């Protein structure tokens, strides 16, 4: 069984960041990604790219990082006590895209690799990641396309993989205090090492490479739909849920902040504008109610 090759993972992730940024810019008439290179105090660093003020994307961030540390923070060892006291390397690409048009969903993707080492002991490593979609005014055909693409990413690795990681995504991206999912899900996996390094790495690449196939057709179909103040206000209200999840539940955010990560890069996932309204409820029979009734509970979107 091949050992972990973090340099190969890092090379793939840098290429993935580049290809995703280039593809997203093709949907944007004027705004471009601005790059910010940074260093991590304990070792390593990253390459953050942010696009803001666009006609298609109000804000989007695509972050690459490769950081080192002398010990893993509590968020990483809570369910893996054998990792306590180990030095670590973590590398990944994480992105969140917040479109301007409320008919275009917000999307999130993340692919990452952890390596935890201790002198004289066998390295412990794992992959994690996935992608998920958060619509405001959903179209069923878009959600089916998203999940079909997610299933295609998984099929070469077994027919049980998509149902397993789809269910994990539904469970992970759930706001307990709201009793609703963050969106319509997709894929989520973590602690993946049971297939060995090469097969696990191949799966990571498949997930990373299918993100654009899942998202760009939806952007292209919906970005020119006319909208008004009502739709914009609802988008901003629902973005508040995104903020709540990221600051209360998200393990990646907690890990980054607890490990002394770069705050600007960690919090770039937050939308540029979000609203909260006290005890707001959608009108009965409205498009806004449709989201609540049909899209914010776990659901099987594909025929078996």
Curated annotation (Swiss-Prot):
It is an enzyme of class 1 (oxidoreductase). GO terms for cellular component: cytoplasm. Its main location: cytoplasm. Residues 242-277 are annotated as: Important for dimerization. It is found in: Cytoplasm. Its cofactor is a divalent metal cation. The record marks 177 as: Important for dimerization. It comes from the Bacteria. GO terms for biological process: protoporphyrinogen IX biosynthetic process. Substrate binds at residues 94, 110-112, 260-262. Its EC number is 1.3.3.3. A divalent metal cation binds at residues 98, 108, 147, 177. It catalyses: coproporphyrinogen III + O2 + 2 H(+) = protoporphyrinogen IX + 2 CO2 + 2 H2O. Belongs to the aerobic coproporphyrinogen-III oxidase family. NCBIfam families: PRK05330.1. PANTHER family: COPROPORPHYRINOGEN III OXIDASE, MITOCHONDRIAL, OXYGEN-DEPENDENT COPROPORPHYRINOGEN-III OXIDASE, MITOCHONDRIAL. This is Oxygen-dependent coproporphyrinogen-III oxidase. It comes from Methylococcus capsulatus (strain ATCC 33009 / NCIMB 11132 / Bath).
């Amino acid at each position: 069984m091949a050992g972990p090759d973090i340099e190969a993972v890092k090379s793939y992730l840098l290429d993935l960041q580049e290809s995703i940024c280039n593809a997203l810019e093709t949907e944007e008439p004027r705004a471009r990604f601005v790059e910010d290179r940074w260093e991590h105090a304990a070792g390593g660093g990253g390459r953050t790219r942010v696009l803001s003020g666009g006609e298609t994307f109000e804000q989007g961030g695509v972050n690459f990082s490769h950081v080192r540390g002398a010990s893993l923070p509590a968020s990483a060892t809570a369910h893996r006590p054998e990792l306590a006291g180990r030095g670590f390397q973590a590398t990944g690409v994480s992105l969140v895209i917040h479109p301007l048009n409320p008919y275009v969903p917000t999307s999130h993707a993340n692919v990452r690799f952890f390596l935890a080492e201790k002198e004289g002991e066998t390295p412990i490593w794992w992959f994690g990641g996935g992608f998920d979609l958060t619509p405001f005014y959903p179209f069923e055909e878009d959600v089916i396309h998203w999940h079909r693409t997610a299933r295609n990413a998984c099929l070469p690795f077994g027919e049980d993989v998509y149902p397993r990681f789809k269910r994990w995504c539904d469970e992970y991206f759930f706001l307990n205090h709201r009793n609703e999912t963050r969106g319509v899900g997709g894929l989520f996996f973590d602690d993946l090492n049971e297939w060995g390094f090469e097969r696990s790495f191949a799966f990571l690449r498949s997930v990373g490479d299918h993100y654009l196939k899942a998202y760009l057709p939806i952007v292209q179909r919906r970005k020119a739909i006319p909208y008004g103040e009502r739709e914009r206000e609802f988008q901003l209200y629902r973005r508040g849920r995104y903020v709540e999840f990221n600051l209360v539940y998200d393990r990646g955010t907690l890990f980054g902040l607890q490990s002394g990560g770069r705050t600007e890069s960690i919090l770039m996932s937050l939308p540029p504008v979000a609203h909260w309204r006290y005890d707001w409820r959608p009108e009965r029979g409205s498009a806004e109610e449709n989201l609540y009734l049909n899209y914010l509970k776990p659901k099987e979107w594909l025929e078996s």
